[in-house]
């Protein structure tokens, strides 16, 4: 409890979302070049962009990161065109084999929010799993559909077209969201399944987290799935999603932390780090679309010392930068698993 309260007291400002960020202004403490280049997920970019100047000041490591999407990050580290990749989707067996000696290290934990644009509606829209999945299936198309209004009696939802917005690029956020849809809707699971590049039966696509958030901000009636930091940056209203306890919850730190309580006491493989649609044992506060995001690093690297130092810093001191951006600090057993994997990064 003291650790959690201490973390919550750390003050950090929400950063502006850019395309690439580095530590050009940080003064290195070592004479030799200590640069690292990474690429991948847009989901953790608000947090990574806080880490970069901090780790530069602490260790003189100059990190440059391009948020090109999880699929791009996996491809880049597999081809070794970057020093590390980042993905919200855990690597499949085939992807791990193709990477030829990579470790997958959880380094951040947050939630997929459901922002929407309903002009003149000040109440919080509540979304059941059936309603949310039916919107993305194209079965619910109006905001005043009885299936939507029955849990939003005081909202006076308008007769307005619903425009579901999805990621058009290979996206780890899409992986987490479609994994959730597959858990709560048998039709979605059988027809579309889980993936970074799902076939969407309804809606419009946009590239990147900033892209989908931008479409929603400009389109009355639209909604999407995106990391909570992007919803906040775009000042979007965020829906509450019903969990297995029947409660409607928001993607805040309490909800993410509650969802993480269902994890095993000891993590032995990154495939165990699944938090979408947690069982009732997670409690009434659990947010049902919480997810980890990962750094992918080669076990053999000429920059192994700096890479280990950066990733270790990220999963320890770097966690203190998370709460203001609504990234929940890693649970202790996840941190312990990360330490074991980081040790595998060698020259």
Show where each model-derived region lies.
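Flexible loop/hinge segments at secondary-structure junctions
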Residues: 22-347
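Short, low-complexity disordered leader/linker segments with a strong preference
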Residues: 1-34
């Amino acid at each position: 409890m003291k650790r959690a309260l201490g973390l919550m007291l750390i003050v950090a400002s929400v950063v502006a979302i850019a395309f690439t960020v580095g530590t050009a202004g940080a003064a290195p403490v070592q004479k030799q070049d200590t640069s690292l280049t990474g690429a991948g997920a847009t989901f953790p970019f608000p947090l990574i962009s806080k880490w970069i100047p901090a780790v530069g000041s602490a260790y003189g490591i100059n990190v440059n990161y391009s948020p090109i999407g999880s699929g791009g990050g996996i491809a880049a580290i597999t081809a070794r065109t970057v020093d590390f990749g980042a993905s919200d989707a855990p690597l499949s067996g085939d992807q791990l084999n193709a990477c030829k000696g990579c470790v997958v290290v959880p380094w951040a934990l947050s939630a997929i929010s459901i922002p929407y644009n309903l002009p003149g509606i000040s109440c919080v829209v509540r979304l059941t799993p059936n309603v949310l999945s039916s919107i993305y299936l194209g079965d619910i198309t109006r905001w005043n559909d009885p299936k939507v209004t029955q849990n939003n009696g005081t909202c006076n939802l308008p007769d307005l077209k619903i425009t579901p917005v999805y990621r058009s690029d290979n996206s780890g956020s899409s992986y987490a969201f479609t994994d959730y849809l597959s858990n709560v809707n048998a039709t979605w699971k059988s027809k579309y399944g889980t993936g970074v590049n799902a076939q969407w039966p309804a809606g419009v696509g946009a590239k990147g987290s900033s892209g989908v958030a931008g479409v929603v901000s400009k389109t009355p009636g639209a909604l999407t799935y995106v990391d909570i930091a992007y919803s906040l940056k775009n000042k979007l209203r965020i829906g509450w999603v019903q969990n297995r306890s029947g409660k409607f919850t928001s993607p805040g730190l309490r909800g993410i932390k509650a969802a993480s309580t269902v994890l095993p006491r000891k993590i032995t493989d990154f495939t165990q780090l699944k938090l979408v649609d947690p069982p009732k044992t997670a409690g009434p506060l659990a947010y049902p679309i919480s997810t980890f995001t990962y750094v992918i690093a080669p076990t053999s690297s000429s920059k192994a010392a700096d890479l280990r130092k950066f990733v270790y810093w990220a999963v320890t001191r770097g966690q203190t930068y998370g709460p203001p951006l609504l990234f929940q600090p890693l649970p202790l057993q996840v941190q312990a698993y990360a330490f074991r994997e980081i040790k595998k990064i060698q020259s």
